[in-house]
């Protein structure tokens, strides 16, 4: 198998597994009465420990980032506003609605990123970016109102946490680039997850005796942490390195689709026609942004003409 096909397969598998992890989280919260806060705490702590262990085995100097005062502060900011907030708001959205809706709303983050950079740089967005912003807004409108502006198809709390999740995901994607370039992805993400989980520990550790535990729930939690977080993250990284960010972004659109399909098959949650239309519009915005990124990359790499 060629490197491009292998990369595409890795990203596609990662996207499907990420979609299934949201469904798995919904199953755990519904069947065990576990709060989204407690699940966020335990998921972050265990996933962080696994990623740091993998990083250490890989030969990374995982403690270097902590020994640098300035970078340690940046890591703390990323841990709180990035890793902790993106996981907590995502699970809160699931708790208030369902995994498929939460996943689709979080996919607004690429549009938020390009809109933010256009504002900061005071540059007019290109036609593809403008269309992406427009389709994401229309898609969100259809998803949350079913086309009726006088009513919401999801609760106001679900809408609030879903939008917050998208903004948190935008921050999570853009903020740590300097840290990752200096220390590597696994140490930065591993520490951010572990620190984020430990921050919640004093507030929610006592909830550990207030929910149902059985064999299927333990298996589901193992899947969520090991398969849906650690393995998935590694697959996506390897795939994105082989095929590049724009292609990886397009293939990652399989995540909300797999979440919607698995929600239907495993949890009995159905999407209506406006839900599907809204989802497809939001996913199309991601594809448009990826197309714009590829166009810009080709323009930059194009050799200059000589007279």
UniProtKB/Swiss-Prot annotation:
GO terms for cellular component: plasma membrane. InterPro entries: AA-Vitamin_Transporters, CO/AA/NH_transpt, EamA_dom. Residues 29-45, 93-99, 146-151, 206-216, 285-307 are cytoplasmic. Residues 16-145, 167-291 form the EamA domain. Residues 1-7, 67-71, 121-124, 173-184, 238-263 are periplasmic. Keywords: Cell inner membrane, Cell membrane, Membrane, Repeat, Transmembrane, Transmembrane helix, Transport. It is a multi-pass membrane protein. The keyword Hydrolase does not apply. The chain crosses the membrane at residues 8-28, 46-66, 72-92, 100-120, 125-145, 152-172, 185-205, 217-237, 264-284. It is found in: Cell inner membrane. Its main location: membrane. The keyword Transmembrane applies. Belongs to the EamA transporter family. This is Uncharacterized inner membrane transporter YicL. It comes from Escherichia coli (strain K12). The gene is yicL.
């Amino acid at each position: 198998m060629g490197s491009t096909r292998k990369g595409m397969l890795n990203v596609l598998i990662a996207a499907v597994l990420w979609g299934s992890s949201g469904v798995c989280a919904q199953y755990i919260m519904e069947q065990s009465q576990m709060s989204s806060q407690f699940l966020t705490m335990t998921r972050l702590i265990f996933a962080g420990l696994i990623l740091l262990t993998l990083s250490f085995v890989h030969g990374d100097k995982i403690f270097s980032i902590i020994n640098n005062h300035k970078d340690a502060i940046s890591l703390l900011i990323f841990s709180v506003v990035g890793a902790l907030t993106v996981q907590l708001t995502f699970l809160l959205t699931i708790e208030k609605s369902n995994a498929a809706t939460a996943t689709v709303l979080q996919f607004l983050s690429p549009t938020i990123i390009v809109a933010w950079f256009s504002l900061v740089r005071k540059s007019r967005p290109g036609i593809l970016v403008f269309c992406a912003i427009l389709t994401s807004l229309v898609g969100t409108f259809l998803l949350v109102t079913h086309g009726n502006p006088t009513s919401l198809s999801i609760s106001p709390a679900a809408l609030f946490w879903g939008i917050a999740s998208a903004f948190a995901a935008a921050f999570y994607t853009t903020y740590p680039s300097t840290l990752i370039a200096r220390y590597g992805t696994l140490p930065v993400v591993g520490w951010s997850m572990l620190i984020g989980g430990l921050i919640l520990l004093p507030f929610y550790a006592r909830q550990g005796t207030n929910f149902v535990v059985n064999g299927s729930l333990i298996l589901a939690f193992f899947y969520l942490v090991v398969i849906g977080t650690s393995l998935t993250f590694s697959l996506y990284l390897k795939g994105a390195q082989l095929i590049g960010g724009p292609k990886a972004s397009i293939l990652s659109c399989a995540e909300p689709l797999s979440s919607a399909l698995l929600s239907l098959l495993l949890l009995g949650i159905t999407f209506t026609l406006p839900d599907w239309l809204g989802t497809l519009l939001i996913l199309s915005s991601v594809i448009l942004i990826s197309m714009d990124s590829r166009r810009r990359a080709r323009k930059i790499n194009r050799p200059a003409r000589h007279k």
